[in-house]
Swiss-Prot record:
CDD domains: ADK. The lineage of its organism: Bacteria, Bacillati, Bacillota, Clostridia, Eubacteriales. Zn(2+) binds at residues 130, 133, 150, 153. AMP binds at residues 31, 36, 57-59, 85-88, 92, 160, 171. Monomer. It comes from the Bacteria. NCBIfam families: adk (TIGR01351), PRK00279.1-2 (NF001380), PRK00279.1-3 (NF001381), PRK14527.1 (NF011100). This is Adenylate kinase. The gene is adk. It is found in: Cytoplasm.
Length: 213
């Protein structure tokens, strides 16, 4: 089974990807991991990507697509894969379609994890980090035993600047703006599966498995 997973920051996409690949016995292709591996192995596409990254420039689509094509051609993808973190735009999705066609691969479903905006805000702004040892807490899901204090070292907990409401709001709006056309693109192809991410992890997983089987 060949799948693609999407979801805004805070939707639990990473958690679902981890359990899903084990459940379906397919390969997890995270674009971040793929980049690191290609650069480390010194592949042709990895070298090209490194040139751009060293200059602090965005890696062009054709290089990313080249890396995705290399990765999908590897033996561990023959039994199926879960693509995570790519595509991010309709242009990339269209290029991915052409690549899959070249490789004779069919994309079976696109999983889109949906969580209401206010819930995402609560999830993302609730993180607290210990100034002393770096331990991470969450005011709702993993609160410290004593408010504002680390369980391990009694250090002071603080909210990172990129976890405040303004920063989180900007990130979420950017995601929505950028991916709305992508969601429409896959919906038009009839392979989009919208999943309610505002429930227990096991319930979300169950809904995904029902949707893709």
């Amino acid at each position: 089974m060949n799948l693609l997973i999407m979801g805004p920051p805070g939707a639990g996409k990473g958690t679902q990807a981890e359990v899903l690949v084990k459940e379906l016995k397919i390969t997890h292709i995270s674009t971040g991991d793929m980049f690191r591996a290609a650069i480390k192995e010194g592949t042709e596409m990895g070298k090209k990507a490194k040139e751009y990254m060293d200059k602090g420039a965005l890696v062009p689509d054709e290089v990313v697509i080249g890396m995705v094509k290399d990765r999908l051609s590897q033996a561990d993808c023959k039994e199926g894969f879960l693509l995570d973190g790519f595509p991010r735009t309709v242009e990339q999705a269209s290029a991915l379609d052409a690549t899959l066609q070249d490789l004779g691969i069919k994309l079976d479903a696109v999983i889109n994890i949906e969580v209401p905006l206010e819930k995402l805000m609560a999830r993302l702004t609730g993180r607290r980090v210990c100034k002393n040892c770096g331990a991470s807490y969450h005011v709702i899901f993993n609160p410290p035993q004593a408010e504002g204090k680390c369980n391990s070292c009694n250090g002071e907990l603080y909210q990172r600047s990129d976890d405040n409401e303004e920063s989180v709001g900007t990130r979420l709006n950017a995601y929505i703006e950028k991916t709305k056309p992508l969601i429409d693109y896959y919906e038009a192809k009839g392979i989009l599966k919208n999943i309610n991410g505002d429930q227990e992890i096991s319930a979300v997983l169950n809904d995904i498995l029902v949707a893709v089987k």
